[in-house]
Structures are given as structure tokens and as C-alpha cells.
Amino acid sequence: YSKGCDSRELFMNYNIAQTEDFEKYLNKYDVIHLDMQWILMDAGAPERISGYINKNVISELADLYKDIDLRDQKTLYGALSVINSMTNNKFVIIIDEWDVLIRYEAANSSVQEEYINFLRGMFKGSEPTKYIELAFLTGILPIKKLKTQSALNNFDEYTMLYAGRLSPYIGFTEDEVRDICDRYGRDFTQVERWYDGYMLGDYHVYNPRAVVNYMLHG
């Protein structure tokens, strides 16, 4: 998705390049990637996370959009809204381990509430759809509920138990493993016996790391 590089050659030899939407989304967006594990360490304390994200990402956006005055913006979603109103640009947001604070600060309700409110400001309701093209969050826990309301009720959740349409992409499918075995001269029946994998919907899926290790090291 990122405008920050030309990734066409990276994907040209893969199946994704044959899909009808490949050109539509390729390198069309500014991508904001937040790794919450690293941010927690850099921020210095759990209660500083929201402020740390707002301050640092707005600073980077100000460097990127020099013609737009973001000095009065205190929140990331406010800055994104201003940029969109001036340019019509939309963003892709990726948050790795979104639930770090929920897991690490399970007993600290004030920190959790502040963080959930930050996420709600970013994603809840119809306003964010004006400036966010796609938001993708990874984590262990399901979407957190704050009191009686879901903090992020406009997300689709995919898990190992309910992978839905993402089933063939969460691991190597059986057809992909057969193809890899052919390329590396390995016996598929051996892989099938040792790394039986798991069923996601209609797909028999194998752990990519286990398969790759076997191909490289036997």
C-alpha cells in the first residue's frame, strides 16, 4: 500500500499480482505502522502511550505535509482529518499487538480506559472512514469492551477458530506445500506426517515456519 516505495517488482511473480485489485491499491497510501510493544518501551510508561503516539506521529506527518499547518492538532485522528480535508488523501493504519496494554496492565483500569478511548477516537463511528482506507490490528485478545460498549465495533475479527475469508492466508495451504516440496525436492507425505497442520474452514493449513525450516534444513 505504501507510497514510500515502489513495491511492484516485489510482488510481480506472485499470485497477488494477478488479482484485479493489485494495481488499484499498489503504493497509493501513506501507511502508519504502530508496533505497540516497541512504543510501550519507548514511551517509558504505560500512561504515556497515547500522548507519545499523538506527538511523534503528528511530528512525522508535519514533516511529510509541510504545506499543512498541524501545530494546533493534539490528536492523531485530528491531524489525519485535517490532512484529508486539505488533500483528500486517505491512510492505511497497521497496529501490531494492539492489546499489549490490555495484557500487561490488566489491573490498571485508568491506563486501559485512556488507551481504549484513544483507539475509539481513531476508529469508532463514521468520521474515520473519511481519512482511513484500511485499518489492520493484530493481537491475542478479542476487541476490548469498555463498560457495556465495544470499543471498536466497526472491525471484523478473524481468529484461528473463525478465520473466515482469511483462512487460506493464515498459513501455507496444502497445494502451496506440495508446490514447495516439488521445488525443494522434498517428500510431501513426510511433511504431512510430521507437520500435520490444522483445519481453517475448508482449508488444510500448515505452519509456514515449520515448513520452511524443513525445506532449508531437513
Regions found by a protein language model. Give the residues of each.
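Phosphate-binding site recognition
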Residues: Y1-G218
